[in-house]
Design a protein with these regions (language model features):
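Short Lys/Arg-enriched alpha/beta "domain-start" segment
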Residues: 1-59
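Short N-terminal secondary-structure initiator segments
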Residues: 23-29, 93-114, 141-150, 201-217, ...
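N-terminal [4Fe-4S]-dependent radical SAM core
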Residues: 62, 67-147, 164-174, 181, ...
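Core AdoMet radical
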Residues: 144, 148, 165-190, 194-223, ...
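Local cysteine-cluster metal-coordination motifs and their immediate loop/turn environment
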Residues: 148-166
Length: 304
């Protein structure tokens, strides 16, 4: 019981087709395979799952998409999940905000920015199609604005959520990758628009689930950040990245980057490379990027 918490609001429940639930019989203490399909929970943002659901997979069961599947149960009229709250930030909490309000705002922005391809992508694909929290925040003019920029990647992560290599056993990714490269003008226009609405603490984040590695478009990022800062643009400019290009990180820091979140599954090179399968960079480059960022006052965090 101490591993469970009430399922947080804005969480999601998944049915796991072709997989039969496994449970513990409280009378015998033995595990039993049920005839019903298994279920799982995706905990709301700011929560970390602590246990996976247990099930038996039937022959011919479909491949599950790359989501986070948490162990969930039901008792006393409500759902419980194995998870812990790890962040008090409310930027991805939409309690009390109707989906209709978000959609109306997104459609208005689509009308107002007909020539900005990146804005069209974020509103149509990310907000209206996927319900991305960062994209919804941009539509509402609060907190964080996502800035996807890259069609390509220099890693071949086993669990990539935007594009799997040909022949992969993972037949479907949760998101579709960006299909064009935006211009600095398109990026900066979104930054200025967001800063004009979220006037207190605007955040701009390169490196989203619907793109490749943003550092493969380093000149675009550097130019966009420089233009925004030189025009007096304020706020936090963040980069979610594999941090594979130390020189680009250094130039971004000089241009006005505020924070860097480094994707890292292990501090052991052999384990890192086994998952990320880097192309054209090494684990040593990642370490050097962190050094370059910290030496220039950039806040560095690790995305495990």
């Amino acid at each position: 019981p101490d591993e469970l918490m009430p399922l947080p609001e804005e969480s999601e429940l998944f049915l796991l087709p072709g997989r039969r639930a496994v449970g513990l019989n409280p009378e015998t203490g033995e595990t039993e395979v049920m005839e019903d399909w298994a279920v799982a929970a995706f905990a709301a943002p700011a929560h970390t799952l602590t246990a996976h659901p247990v099930y038996m997979t039937d022959e011919g069961a479909p491949m599950l998409p790359l989501f986070a599947y948490g162990a969930v149960g039901f008792a006393n009229g409500r759902f419980y999940v194995c998870a812990k709250k790890v962040d008090e930030d409310v930027r991805q909490v939409f309690k009390g905000i109707s989906r209709g309000k978000i959609d109306r705002s997104a459609r208005k922005i689509i009308e107002d920015f007909p020539d900005n391809r990146l804005m069209q992508h974020i509103m149509q694909n990310c907000t209206l199609r996927y319900g991305c929290p960062a994209a919804k925040n941009l539509s509402l003019g609060r907190y964080e604005a996502p800035l996807p920029t890259s069609r390509t990647c220099n890693a071949r992560c086993i669990g990539c959520i935007s594009q799997q290599e040909e022949g992969s056993k993972i037949c479907a990714t949760p998101q579709c990758r960006l299909t064009f490269t935006p211009t600095p003008e398109e990026v900066v226009e979104i930054m200025r628009f967001h800063a004009g609405r979220e006037t207190e603490k605007p955040v701009f984040s390169f490196g989203q689930g619907c793109e490749g590695e943003p550092l493969t478009e380093a000149p675009l990022l550097i130019e966009s950040v420089r233009r925004y800062r030189e025009a007096g643009g304020h706020g936090t400019i963040n980069l979610n990245s594999n941090s594979s290009r130390p020189q680009a990180i250094a130039e971004l820091a000089e241009a006005g980057l505020t924070s860097l979140r480094v994707s890292l599954n292990s501090a052991r090179p052999e384990v890192y490379e086994r998952y990320y399968r880097p192309h054209g960079y090494t684990f040593g480059d990642v370490r050097q990027s962190i050094i370059e960022a910290r030496s220039r006052g950039v806040h560095v965090a690790v995305n495990l």
